[in-house]
Design a protein with these regions (language model features):
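Membrane-interface extramembranous regions
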Residues: 2-133
Length: 133
């Protein structure tokens, strides 16, 4: 099945395909490392479990979210169809936006939601350069 994705309108015309691919893989690797680490932390670190309780989420949600993150990481790193990668990027966008909203809703400061915001920047760069490839 052929992809219907189009090159982003803001794409710089003078960036080489090799540079685009290199930047994509560097940013995507950093993003996937962050998502893998948070998936691990959600499953194994008690202080992260306490944070989920503080945010009002049930204990089972950590397991579900970690599994979804790991599946998304695999889809971004593997040679998967474009539609599946789009779904992975959409899932990560929802996850990161929800993390920001949840932390702000309970009054947490930037020390709590800053990582989600920084990871969101990595997400945006990864998605942008994926679309350029």
């Amino acid at each position: 099945m052929e992809s219907t994705l189009q090159r982003p309108a803001l794409a710089p015309a003078n960036i080489s395909p090799k540079a685009t691919t290199a930047v994509y893989w560097i940013v995507t690797a950093l993003f996937c490392l962050q998502m893998s680490f948070t998936a691990y932390a959600q499953l194994h670190l008690p202080q992260v479990a306490e944070t989920f309780t503080h945010l009002g989420f049930p204990a089972w949600f950590r397991v579900e979210l970690s599994c979804a993150k790991l599946l998304g990481v695999v889809l971004l790193l593997a040679p998967a169809p474009a539609r599946l990668k789009e779904w992975a990027y959409a899932g990560f966008a929802i996850n990161l936006a929800s993390a920001l909203i949840a932390h702000m809703a309970v009054g947490d400061g930037p020390e709590a939601w800053g990582w989600a915001a920084a990871t969101g920047v990595l997400w945006a760069l990864s998605y942008f350069f994926w679309r350029l490839k």
